[in-house]
Structure formats: structure tokens, C-alpha cells
Amino acid sequence: MHSPEARLAVARLAPSRIREVANVGMGREDVLAFWFGESDEVTPAPIRAAANEALAAGDTFYTQNLGLPALREAIARYQSNLHRAIAAESVVVTNSGMSALMIATQALVGPGDRVVVVTPVWPNLLEIPKILGASVESV
């Protein structure tokens, strides 16, 4: 059976520099793990308890595409108190920063577009426009 090949735009993507660094540093006690932006602390007990309660209650199904309405409302309230008023309808919850960046870029960038990126920047960000068929110029 012939394996499918990735589109040329995907095959040309640079490997994740963050993953390269993580692979070298993982498991070493003399290295501080700053590569993925995750805490070195265990997830707080109230969050773990809420996750366990949701699992026990069978709350394990897909949610609305834009995120749970209660979560979107809470984020809107928080942002409104912190900065300026924002409606819950303007909030979209994603599963990661990369997903959010990909969705936002898909809304703005298409094949043949040229994206100018002010560097330094998170290395993975430079690859998103390339996936969409755009060229990237770093300045």
C-alpha cells in the first residue's frame, strides 16, 4: 500500500525548534523546562477535583464549537473588568494557543499572500502562514 504524501507546503515546514529543544532537555534535572509554556507545578487540587467531578458525572461529550457558553461568559466578564467591555459572543475558546493562532490566520491569510512577521517571535508562528500557502518575510 502506498503511503499518502503530505502537501508540498506541509512537507516544506521547518521542524519545531521548541520540540528540538525539549527533546534535548527532557529528563535532565539540570535544565529548567521552559519549552512548552507549562508550569512545573502540579495542577492545583481544585482544578483536578473539578475534572474528576466532570468525569464522574459523565460530562465527557463535545461542546459547542465556540466553547461552553458559561466559560465564554466568564472570560468576557473577566476581560471586561480587566480592560474594556467585551460580549461573550465575541469570545471563542480553543484547545490551545496554536489552534487559536491557526484559526485567526485562516480567517485572514490565503494562498499567495505575503505575511510580514516582526521577529523575534515564537518559531511555530512562522509556519502557520506557510501551511496556508502564503509566504513569510521576517523583519
Segments from the language model and where they lie:
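N-terminal small-domain helix-loop-helix segment of the aminotransferase-like
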Residues: A11-S96, I103
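Short, hydrophobic alpha-helical packing/hinge segments within bilobed ligand-binding/sensory domains
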Residues: A100-L101, L125
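Generic N-terminal amphipathic, Lys/Arg-enriched alpha-helix
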Residues: M1-V10
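Intrinsically disordered, low-complexity sequence elements enriched in Ser/Thr/Gly/Pro
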Residues: E5, P15-R17, N124
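Short, local alpha-helical segments
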Residues: P4, A57, S138-V139
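PLP-dependent aminotransferase-like
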Residues: Q106-V139
